From Swiss-Prot:
Disulfide bonds: none annotated. Monomer. Homodimer below pH 6.8. It catalyses: N(1)-(5-phospho-beta-D-ribosyl)glycinamide + (6R)-10-formyltetrahydrofolate = N(2)-formyl-N(1)-(5-phospho-beta-D-ribosyl)glycinamide + (6S)-5,6,7,8-tetrahydrofolate + H(+). This is Phosphoribosylglycinamide formyltransferase. Catalyzes the transfer of a formyl group from 10-formyltetrahydrofolate to 5-phospho-ribosyl-glycinamide (GAR), producing 5-phospho-ribosyl-N-formylglycinamide (FGAR) and tetrahydrofolate. Keywords: Purine biosynthesis, Transferase. Changing residue 135 to A/L: Reduces activity about 1000-fold. Changing residue 106 to E/H/I/K/L/Y: Loss of activity. Changing residue 121 to Q: Increases Km for 5'-phosphoribosylglycinamide 4-fold. Coiled coil: none annotated. The record marks 144 as: Raises pKa of active site His. Inhibited by N10-(bromoacetyl)-5,8-dideazafolate. Changing residue 106 to A/D/G/S: Reduces activity about 2000-fold. The lineage of its organism: Bacteria, Pseudomonadati, Pseudomonadota, Gammaproteobacteria, Enterobacterales.
Amino acid sequence: MNIVVLISGNGSNLQAIIDACKTNKIKGTVRAVFSNKADAFGLERARQAGIATHTLIASAFDSREAYDRELIHEIDMYAPDVVVLAGFMRILSPAFVSHYAGRLLNIHPSLLPKYPGLHTHRQALENGDEEHGTSVHFVTDELDGGPVILQAKVPVFAGDSEDDITARVQTQEHAIYPLVISWFADGRLKMHENAAWLDGQRLPPQGYAADE
């Protein structure tokens, strides 16, 4: 299975995916990594793993649609079976989402539908939440609103900082994102009727781990 990963920053989830491919936990190969930031450390992670890297800077394009058209063109040179967003900090155009419908995954640092968008850890702290977490979902036109596949929960303790919660959530992200990608690679996971399906069973709104 051909995997293309899109990043904007450190690329810790990218590293987890690369490692899972190396150990055959994911039966696939990361063919290319794209970033909208030339200084994203994730590009160096990719280069160290011998993976092709590409940088597309938004300021070189006159619209989001033009950017996404070029991004589609370059991604499709790698014939991806799945496109994985791993901290890609751009809102994608409807044309991009439609082009990769059913094979476009994202990870979001909250227990969706709670806290779509930015600053999720801060919101969890400010609201006094006792648990927080992360969600892997299919991407649709609704921002962070596509069908949830799998969630992982973490506790929030008194005295926690944003950094504490970030570290706790990222540990879970590095476990569940490769797992979901492996389900996709094995043909177990699909999007159908705007819902996530695993092994032929429609998953509930909060995904596989909803009742855990």
